[in-house]
Regions:
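Hydrophobic, well-ordered secondary-structure elements that form the walls
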Residues: 1, 35, 73, 424
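Cysteine-nucleophile active-site neighborhood
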Residues: 1-22
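Catalytic beta-strand/loop cores that center a nucleophilic Ser/Cys/Thr
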Residues: 16-64
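Short, acidic Gly/Pro/Ser/Thr-rich loop/turn segments
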Residues: 22, 39-42, 75-77, 168-172, ...
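Hydrophobic transmembrane alpha-helical segments of multi-pass transport and channel proteins
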Residues: 26, 74, 78, 368, ...
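Short hydrophobic-aromatic micro-motifs
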Residues: 32-35, 67-72, 163-164
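Acyltransferase
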Residues: 60-99
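N-terminal loops that bind phosphate or other acidic moieties
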Residues: 98-462
Length: 462
């Protein structure tokens, strides 16, 4: 935002919601007015504003099931339906928050990041001898990490990617190319250090921590025991989820246990001195579970958010869309209750990753999100406790169609746009070398004071 220099008056207007939001359903309108001293280059696009005086239109505002933010000022007098929806949303949020805090008491331990450290890190960036905001998102992320770590002396040298491995009962419905045995094989390959993410992690000095949170197989084809496999952390809650078209994927107790296993994994990482983490996953069928969650949480048509996963043909994609549409029909009523929805159709890998994000916020460790599965988990964690969003760093906008709308819902921008679809945390691990380079500039670069040149003035428009 920036100071407009004078009072901006737009008068009375009609505001039409372009999607379902807390204040109105899609295409419903309500009255508002607008005046402000500050302006923004990013005023939002979730509402269409129609000016009463001349019928001119513009896009403005941000809206979701729990948020309204924007320049149009809403007044409840004469907008009784909007007022009623607002109060209903408040009461529902209060009820859900109370239930969630009882099930996951760690949510009440989360505090906001250190804003003083954020401001000092911004000031440090502005003092470096380079164009203002020249490193773009990388500057913002290093600044964010300063706020998380409560210091301008940022450290990201001890790092790990936590890969939650689990099977999904929905594979019974023919929505994948391969069977569940692949999950166990790839998970053990990670433990052996020979999977894709391991090769990439070696380049960035990142430890790989594969976690068995719900692998279906007890043994590999050669008889090797999966539960005791060396360097595969055993936190198994159940032997894969159930087919959610027949019954809920897991019980509430199993869901909460999986979330807590993720929190405990971050607690262990904190004790070992890790100062930044990444999220990854492995589980046949998990693009179906994650896309179904995204479709319901964001109220989007299955066709708009469903991708081919690990390479489905046209008939396989059609079947996957049908399964997700059926999930929405069966469980769409839980759109405002993320834990119940996750219990009903989610995977144990997603539940464990929700715990990782919660743990990152509890223990003050930044967490880099990977692709669509990890980002759905991030959205659920943020719905449980909005402060968690400040602890999450986005790595890439993957190939799955749901990725962009998920990132938009979190208010985040991806650094990497490379149509990634590998999983395992590979996209998140790719972020670490980029962060290293940005941090080197942050720490070591010449400042304007060093060369006795006046710094650029920040007008807030870069």
């Amino acid at each position: 935002g920036y100071n407009a220099g004078k009072l901006q008056r737009f008068g009375y207007m009609s505001v039409k919601s372009v999607k379902n939001t807390m204040l109105a359903d899609k295409n419903q309108s309500f009255r508002a007015h607008e005046f402000h001293y500050w302006n923004s280059d990013c005023p939002g696009s979730d509402y269409e504003v129609i000016k009463a005086s001349d019928n001119s239109t513009a896009s403005a505002g941000y809206g979701s099931d729990t948020l309204y933010a924007g320049f149009p000022h809403i007044y409840f007098y004469g907008n009784e339906n909007v007022a009623e929806r607002f109060m209903d949303a408040c009461m529902k949020y209060k009820k859900n928050s109370r239930q969630e805090a009882e099930l996951i008491p760690e949510l009440d331990k989360i505090k906001g990041i250190n804003r003083d450290a954020v401001m000092k890190a911004k000031a440090h960036w502005n003092g470096i001898a380079k164009p203002l905001h020249g490193l773009g998102l990388m500057e913002e992320i290093i600044t964010q990490i300063a706020g998380i770590q409560n210091t301008v002396d940022v450290h990201i040298d001890k790092r790990a990617v936590i890969v939650m491995c689990a099977d999904n009962g929905i594979v019974e419905e023919g929505i994948t190319q391969t069977g569940q045995d692949v999950t166990a094989v790839v998970s053990c390959n990670m433990a052996d250090g020979i999977s894709s993410v391991c090769r990439m992690a070696a380049c960035s000095k990142t430890d790989v921590i594969p976690v068995n949170i719900g692998i279906a197989a007890d043994k590999l084809a050669d008889g090797t025991d999966v539960g005791t496999y060396k360097d595969l952390v055993n936190r198994r809650v159940m032997t894969g989820t159930r087919n959610f078209l027949k019954e809920p994927a897991m019980s509430q107790e199993q869901l909460i246990q999986a979330v807590h296993e993720g929190i405990k994994q971050v607690e262990w990482c904190s004790e070992q001195g890790y100062n930044i983490l990444a999220t990854g996953e492995m589980g046949i069928g998990n693009t179906t579970t994650s896309t179904a969650l995204a479709s319901i949480l964001l109220n989007l048509e299955p066709e708009a958010v469903t991708g081919r996963g690990a390479g489905l043909d046209d008939s396989g994609l059609k079947r996957k869309v049908e399964v997700i549409a059926k999930a929405k029909e069966m469980y769409g009523r839980y759109a405002d209750n993320p834990l119940k929805l996750l219990q009903s159709i989610g995977g144990l890998d997603i539940a464990g990753l929700v715990g990782v994000y919660i743990g990152g916020a509890v223990y003050g460790i930044p967490v880099v999100a990977d692709g669509v599965i990890a980002t759905v988990a991030a959205l659920i964690a943020v719905k449980l406790q909005p402060e968690i969003n400040d602890y999450i760093i986005v790595s890439h906008q993957g190939k799955e169609p749901a990725m962009k709308v998920l990132l938009d819902s979190l208010g985040k921008k991806a650094v990497i746009h490379a149509e990634l679809a590998l999983g395992e945390g590979t996209g998140a691990v790719m972020m670490f070398p980029l962060l290293d380079m940005a941090l080197q500039v942050y720490r070591e670069n010449t400042t304007f004071d060093d060369i006795q040149i006046a710094a650029y003035e920040d007008y807030g428009k870069c």
